[in-house]
Amino acid sequence: MSVRPPGNPTGRPVAISRRGRAIAVAVVVLIILIQVLPRLNTAYTDWLWFGSVDATSVFRTELLTRLGLFVLVGLLTGIAVSAGAVLAYRFRPVFLAQAGLPDAVARYRAAMGGSPAKTLIWIPIVLGVLAGSIAQTGWQTVLAFFNATPFGRTDPQFGLDISFYAFQLPMWRAVVTWVMVAVVLAFLANLVTHYLVGGLRPGAREGALTRAARIQLVTLAGIFVLAKAAAYWLDRYELLFRENATFTGASYTDVNALMPAKIFMFAVALVCAIAFFSAIVIKDLRIPALATVLLLFSALVVGSAWPLAVEQFSVNPNRAEKEREYIARNIEATRAAYDIGDDRVTYIENWGAPSPNPRQAASDTTTLSNVRILDPNVLSPTFTQMQQLRNFYGFPETLSLDRYTIDGEMQDFLVAARELDPSALQANQRDWINRHTVYTHGNGFVAAPANRVNEIADDAGSDRGGLPNFQVSDLDTINNDQEMMIPVTQPRIYFGELIAQSDPDYAIVGDNGEGPREYDTDTTQYTYTGSGGVPIGGWINRTAYALKFAERNILLSGLINDNSKIIYDRDPRDRVQKVAPWLTTDTTTYPAVIDGRIKWIVDGYTTLKTYPYAELSSLEAMTADSTDELGGRVQVDEEVSYIRNSVKATVDAYDGTVDLYAFDESDPVLQTWMKAMPGIVQPESEISEELRDHFRYPEDLFKVQRELLARYQVDDPGQFFTNDAFWSVPSDPTVTSSIQNPQSTPTGGPLGGPAGGSTGGTGGTQTVDREGPSQPPYYVITSDPADPESDEPTFQLISAFRGYEREFLSAHMSASSDPDTYGEITVRVQRPIEPLAQGPNQAQDIMIASPAIAEDRRLWGETAEVTEGNLLALPLANDSVLYVEPIYTQRKDQDSAYPRLLRVMVSYDRAVGYAPTLYEALRQVGIETDPNLVRIDESGEAEAEAEESSGRPGAETSSPRPSTPSGTGGASDAQRGAAIDEINSALNAVRSAQSSGDLGDLGQALDDLQAAVDAYQALGNGN
């Protein structure tokens, strides 16, 4: 017996009053306005912004594609759902018994009987809006599908062009997925409606389903199974970029078991769909029920159990041989997808002299004369303190490196734009007028030669010396007609990374009729005259931006008139990504002076994650290194299996103009997007020579290729499977070492071995894997890797490789940034001789284990903070690798303190040099060169006088060391091993003494360590 709800004895639907309806309608309209108006305002301001950068076509193409997808998918989804419900209602039973029904069902039936359209209309609308909202996010997939460009390269399994996987397969997968979802929604709508109108009567004696219900439900189920069959067919192709334990791509099991299983499941699904459709004419639901069981059973046995059995009983016992063919496919595809094939990478096998020769190393004058001693990751505070000018100017935490031709010679510089730093404004400078109409721009371009300081610094307690030799181009130098090494005609900076860090980052500029208002210098104001920015004089635009930034002053301020503009989105990287949303940009942008104007250069990548057999990798993980801790940008968390630096972009620092240039016109992904959005990317021929001279090989691409080359330099699939020929990217020794903590000691032995352990005389072939972030690559000027005897300097991005889970040096990678050889990668594979060449961490260990360095560290640590600069691994001639590391000090407990270069450490063939000058440090390891060639100061004094300065603080007292002679005069491996053991023992003693705090014991331990090092070096001298 049913019970009617209290207060409604009739059981009829409760009528809503006219006032109640009006209130309900008003609430709905208000909700819609709250949701829709901000989106309409955003769309309008975006349209204005794109117009200000001449990229309206991008906005229009994206908007129309999104709207088209929203309407099409939303409409089709709504039609599918409503059709399922309407058909069920249309073919409802004529005579419907109400007795015995739950009250809720009875009320719904009564409501639908009176006005079914009003009852049913909201469900399809809501579901259609949701489906359309989800579908419009795939607008890039649709555009790529309709503008696909062939790769001219096929996959090894199906022989299809790579473009099918890149552009077509994602679209077909999206269509099949939508069909399955739409059919499920229609099925549920049909099922529920049939239940409510009586077409589905569970427990009824005369049958649970009416004929109409049976036909409609089995038809929808059959369509779903057909879509599932299509999904099985597409699954075969997606196996080609499936991740396996060893590699990406279809494995032996995938090709020989899972692919046939997918075909079998495709056939079974077709049969099952026919079985479902047969129930339209055959009144027997056991047929589709059996079909469902068959499909599930086949999926379990054929789709899962069979491939698992093949994996366990056929592949696992002989996996290396079984997977050989498929690993070879992965190697070939990965090299092609990441542009690290033989056409791009040159391997120099057995690089390095059997016995390092300092004289031969000294012949590489191009590299030695350009050794970089200024670290862009350390010296930002120095730039800020010495070149800030005003409290509201600033520099990024990490400076940039670029090169300029000065007096006909290439010179690398630390460079930075002096930007406005809104976070540094004082309280009286932070009101709305000052923040957005007065303090609007930065001033100047600051550079410093990377291999020079103003003068040599001897004392950590002194303020003299060790500072960059600044070359400034700003308003003062222009107004005073001062000579500029790097001339700039427009030094004002309205767009940059630092100024964009404020929230919101907009400025309102233009002639307000009352004269210049913007701060320029202490004695002058300025009015922006650039082409960039959105006109904001009209009330419509003012209202739109007042809503966008939630700022009423934009509406009320009398400083805004018909000449006013608003500039925002001032981060160069964000501007490029907004104009080209299909690009992934490099995390590093850098300023360059091009034709007298400061321009930000941004590297843009085209990427895919569906390249068959190519290694699928995380961009964020592969580009992470120790510089992330400095607050730098982190790459997007996106997985890719293909990458190209296809676009070089510039953003004018004054007016924000965005220019995109095709840099790899052969890239099919770039070609696809140039067809989808014509006119946005300029052809490569439009790149000026001056701009091309400042292009750098991008860091993020280099890091990705470096990580992959560590494994994919292996040609043999068998070696690839066993990992025994892999390399590794070393951890950053300047982060993992302890030079910044005077009370601690190195974490490894003097040659990178475990503390207190023997390396067996092999030069450090231990299996300890260093913890810590990866060492970043470094920009340097060196001799040509392909022709080290040439005097022509080249601008290279370099990195070392260590052995797999070893610390010795395995190889050295460099990528050229020179216009004529841009992108050519050279890998010097270290000659496998004993003792093995030092890796970066081993070189770091042996340098900071030097007694002279340890003593200086102890003394300086009382009053100053000691910071290590970047450890550069520089191949010299065809000889060996020279490690160079600058040391900086900064006074403690002073807000205005800043780092200064105090010492230079070098390591060559396990010998250590340590001095205030590079020349002295090189002499200590036996590399004699022209003192004027490697002079690092600008005092004008030749460093030949430095030969008498061995008594300077911090200078090593050892004499120049020639190379180890060959033959009987050299030390045996056993002698070397014993000497290394002595050094390790001495290091342990130093650690113990430091832990105890006994200065007497520490002094004795340091003396013992010095004696052990001297004994080891004596073996190298053949004594």
Model-found features: residue ranges?
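Soluble extracytoplasmic regions of secretory-pathway and membrane proteins
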Residues: 3-20, 26-51, 56-996, 1000-1021
